[in-house]
Amino acid sequence: MNKFLIIDGLNLVRRIYAAIPDENDMDSLTDRVSVACTKLLRIHHPTHVAIVWDGDEISWRKQLYPDYKKGRKPMPEPLAAGLSALQEHLKSLPIQSIYAAAEADDVIATLAMKTAKAQGEAVIVSTDKGFSQLNHPRISQWDHFNQQYLNIAELEQKLGVDRNQFLDLMALAGDSGNKIPGIAGIGPKSAAELLRTFRTLATLFSSLSNLGAKQAKKLAEGRDMARLSYKLAQLQTDLPLNINLRDFRVNGPANTQQAE
């Protein structure tokens, strides 16, 4: 069975970079990233591996909602200046790069789902909880920094909803980290309570007459924003990727791919 290790490039690199005392020490960063990647290969024994990077194009989410990810700290200048050299160095490892047109997340999600549907196993290396929406028994998520798989049961308990309600929760309450708005006046706790009662957004919005007037008004006025937020939070899993799985076989020929 194929096992595809899919590394969220900037998620890994930026976390490692943040722990380096000297922000200009790119040699140390390169060494630490190389060690991390080698460790990932040793732990997971994949048949295939890729590291996916964000591209420079404006994402469709930003075009749909200009405030998406607004206010995020930009990449530190030393890292931005040294990233190309780091990516070039990684070619010396048996880890091939894929460059997304815009956001890496949709490419990662598509790779994972295509692998799972082909009866393979996909392991996503990232601390981004957004990947938890990929509800498939052959997709898992590895937190390199805590050296453990994402525990979905713990996340469900923390959020107060089932996994299949994660997107509905973000549609109602938003996601402050990505500046996904949600509905004004509906926080995570009240959103979870609503979903425990009504289970889905569709049922909730068809049952507003069962709610108090104030809450029903918030939901009615925020319905369009909830739909937008759901769309922003939902990962694309069917992108047309111009890649060949053979190119990412461990110990295969070095190659760099551009995702379309």
UniProtKB/Swiss-Prot annotation:
<protein>
    <recommendedName>
        <fullName>Flap endonuclease Xni</fullName>
        <ecNumber>3.1.-.-</ecNumber>
    </recommendedName>
</protein>
<dbReference type="Pfam" id="PF01367">
    <property type="entry name" value="5_3_exonuc"/>
</dbReference>
<feature type="binding site">
    <location>
        <position position="181"/>
    </location>
    <ligand>
        <name>K(+)</name>
    </ligand>
</feature>
<keyword id="KW-0378">Hydrolase</keyword>
<dbReference type="GO" id="GO:0030955">
    <property type="term" value="F:potassium ion binding"/>
</dbReference>
<feature type="binding site">
    <location>
        <position position="186"/>
    </location>
    <ligand>
        <name>K(+)</name>
    </ligand>
</feature>
<dbReference type="GO" id="GO:0003677">
    <property type="term" value="F:DNA binding"/>
</dbReference>
<dbReference type="GO" id="GO:0008409">
    <property type="term" value="F:5'-3' exonuclease activity"/>
</dbReference>
<feature type="binding site">
    <location>
        <position position="172"/>
    </location>
    <ligand>
        <name>K(+)</name>
    </ligand>
</feature>
<feature type="binding site">
    <location>
        <position position="183"/>
    </location>
    <ligand>
        <name>K(+)</name>
    </ligand>
</feature>
<dbReference type="InterPro" id="IPR029060">
    <property type="entry name" value="PIN-like_dom_sf"/>
</dbReference>
<comment type="similarity">
    <text>Belongs to the Xni family.</text>
</comment>
<feature type="binding site">
    <location>
        <position position="173"/>
    </location>
    <ligand>
        <name>K(+)</name>
    </ligand>
</feature>
<dbReference type="Pfam" id="PF02739">
    <property type="entry name" value="5_3_exonuc_N"/>
</dbReference>
<feature type="domain" description="5'-3' exonuclease">
    <location>
        <begin position="164"/>
        <end position="259"/>
    </location>
</feature>
<dbReference type="InterPro" id="IPR038969">
    <property type="entry name" value="FEN"/>
</dbReference>
<dbReference type="InterPro" id="IPR020045">
    <property type="entry name" value="DNA_polI_H3TH"/>
</dbReference>
<keyword id="KW-0238">DNA-binding</keyword>
<comment type="function">
    <text>Has flap endonuclease activity. During DNA replication, flap endonucleases cleave the 5'-overhanging flap structure that is generated by displacement synthesis when DNA polymerase encounters the 5'-end of a downstream Okazaki fragment.</text>
</comment>
<feature type="binding site">
    <location>
        <position position="105"/>
    </location>
    <ligand>
        <name>Mg(2+)</name>
    </ligand>
</feature>
<feature type="region of interest" description="Interaction with DNA">
    <location>
        <begin position="185"/>
        <end position="190"/>
    </location>
</feature>
<keyword id="KW-0630">Potassium</keyword>
<dbReference type="InterPro" id="IPR008918">
    <property type="entry name" value="HhH2"/>
</dbReference>
<dbReference type="GO" id="GO:0033567">
    <property type="term" value="P:DNA replication, Okazaki fragment processing"/>
</dbReference>
<dbReference type="InterPro" id="IPR022895">
    <property type="entry name" value="Xni"/>
</dbReference>
<keyword id="KW-0255">Endonuclease</keyword>
<dbReference type="GO" id="GO:0017108">
    <property type="term" value="F:5'-flap endonuclease activity"/>
</dbReference>
<keyword id="KW-0460">Magnesium</keyword>
<dbReference type="InterPro" id="IPR020046">
    <property type="entry name" value="5-3_exonucl_a-hlix_arch_N"/>
</dbReference>
<keyword id="KW-0479">Metal-binding</keyword>
<keyword id="KW-0540">Nuclease</keyword>
<dbReference type="InterPro" id="IPR036279">
    <property type="entry name" value="5-3_exonuclease_C_sf"/>
</dbReference>
<dbReference type="GO" id="GO:0000287">
    <property type="term" value="F:magnesium ion binding"/>
</dbReference>
<dbReference type="InterPro" id="IPR002421">
    <property type="entry name" value="5-3_exonuclease"/>
</dbReference>
